[in-house]
């Protein structure tokens, strides 16, 4: 699997190539957390967001379907005692309805065959009134990193810019979405909406 193969060098690529946007994005997402929040993070990758979210919340469940990525998350978060790290599929979550106050799914929507199914699952497991936070790289198609990742088998399903990212949520009937762009070589647009 592509993501397990690159797990060992993923942070290096991300920090060298896109460190500015990644720092801004992880800091912004972490700022949305509250100390009493129970948070689900899907597609946690190497724990880039996990390590910033966990210290701010009551508990964090970080999931990914790549065991290689989960090993990196475990190592990065080893000093945090309020995090549960486990294998999981964003399109088929094992959690009960209304189990979390917030859910984060960073940089994964563009990889999914059925992103609507994933968002429906996030909506199912987040309590009414809770937040769903979906950061996604924009203008990624033109980037050196996208070309490199695709060459080695990443298989991106879609590419976003500021406009079609907003259209993406509109077509799913999700309203009142706020957007926050974090600039960098691969800028990231953080979409946030309240679960209704």
Label each PLM-derived region with a short phrase.
Residues 38, 130-131:
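Short glycine-centered segments of the SAM/dcSAM-binding site in methyltransferase folds
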Residues 191-196:
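C-terminal lobe and adjacent flexible extensions of AdoMet/dcAdoMet transferase-like proteins
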């Amino acid at each position: 699997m592509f993501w397990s193969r690159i797990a060992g060098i993923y942070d290096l690529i991300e920090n060298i190539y896109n460190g500015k946007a990644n720092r801004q994005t992880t800091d912004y997402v972490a700022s949305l957390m509250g100390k009493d929040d129970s948070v689900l993070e899907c597609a946690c990758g190497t724990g880039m967001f996990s390590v910033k979210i966990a210290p701010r919340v009551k508990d964090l469940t970080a999931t990914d379907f790549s065991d290689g990525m989960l090993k990196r998350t475990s190592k990065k978060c080893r000093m945090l005692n309020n995090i549960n790290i486990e294998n999981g599929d964003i399109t088929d979550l094992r959690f009960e309805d209304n189990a979390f106050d917030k859910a984060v799914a960073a940089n994964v929507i563009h990889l999914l065959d059925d992103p609507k199914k994933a968002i429906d699952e996030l909506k199912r497991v987040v309590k009414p009134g809770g937040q769903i936070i979906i950061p996604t790289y924009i203008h990624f198609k033109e980037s050196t990193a996208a070309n490199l990742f695709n060459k080695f088998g990443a298989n991106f399903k879609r590419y976003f810019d500021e406009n079609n990212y907003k259209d993406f949520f509109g077509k799913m009937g999700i309203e009142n979405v706020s957007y926050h762009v974090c600039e960098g070589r691969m800028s990231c647009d953080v979409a946030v909406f309240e679960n209704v």
